[in-house]
Regions:
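Short cysteine clusters
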Residues: 110
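Ser/Thr-glycine-rich phosphate-binding loops at phosphate-binding pockets of nucleotides
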Residues: 117
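Conserved G/P- and acidic residue-centered "switch" motifs that form tight phosphate/ATP-binding loops
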Residues: 113
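Cys-dependent protein tyrosine phosphatase-like superfamily
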Residues: 1-107, 120-169
Length: 169
C-alpha cells in the first residue's frame, strides 16, 4: 500500500501544486495534510501562511527546503500506521500550542495525511479542547475523513487521555 500511495503522491505532485488531503482544522492556525513531495507543494503550504511544520513519519522533509526560510520544524519518527509514545505526543501537542500561541500557523503531516496526522491532531484536541479520546477521534474524522487509521493509534489516544489525567493529579 505504501508504494502505491507514494506513487500516487509523486504523480499528484507533478499535476498539482498542493499536498494531498490539505485542510484547516482551525482556520489559519492548524492544518493537516499528506506529504509535500515537491518544492512547489512546500511553497504552496508556506503561501497558505504556514510558519511551522510537524512531520510525523520515518523520514524528515529535505533540509534544503528550509534554507533561508523562517520556518520552524519538528520531526517525529513514527512508522506508518504507528503512533508516537505518550511523551512524544505531549511534546508535539505542546510544540503546536506554543507555535499557535506565537501566531505561527502549524501544518501536521505524515505520508497520506490520515493516520499519524490524525492521531497528532486528535491528541491536540484531547489536551487543548478537553475532549475524551473517543470525542477527539470522532471530531477529527468528521473534519478529516480517514483520520486515525489503526487500533494502535486509537489505543495511543486513549492512553494519552489517561496520561494527561494522571499528569494533572
Amino acid at each position: 500500500l505504501t508504494k502505491i500511495g507514494n506513487a500516487y503522491r509523486r504523480f499528484h505532485g507533478m499535476v498539482s501544486d498542493r499536498p494531498t488531503n490539505f485542510s484547516w482544522v482551525t482556520e489559519g492556525k492548524l492544518a493537516g495534510s499528506g506529504l509535500p513531495v515537491t518544492q512547489d507543494e512546500f511553497k504552496w503550504v508556506l503561501d497558505k501562511g504556514i510558519k511551522s511544520i510537524v512531520t510525523v513519519r520515518e523520514v524528515p522533509l529535505p533540509s534544503q527546503w528550509f534554507d533561508g526560510g523562517d520556518i520552524d520544524y519538528m520531526h517525529l519518527m513514527v512508522e506508518d500506521y504507528g503512533a508516537p509514545t505518550m511523551e512524544v505526543l505531549d511534546e508535539a501537542v505542546n510544540y503546536i500550542d506554543k507555535k499557535i500561541g506565537s501566531c505561527k500557523a502549524v501544518l501536521v503531516h505524515c505520508a497520506a495525511g490520515k493516520g499519524r496526522t490524525g492521531a497528532v491532531l486528535a491528541a491536540y484536541m484531547i489536551k487543548k479542547e478537553n475532549l475524551t479520546a473517543e470525542q477527539a477521534i470522532e471530531k477529527i474524522r468528521l473534519m478529516r475523513p480517514g483520520s486515525v487509521q489503526s487500533i494502535t493509534q486509537e489505543t495511543a489516544l486513549s492512553m494519552y487521555e489517561k496520561y494527561l489525567k494522571i499528569k494533572k493529579q
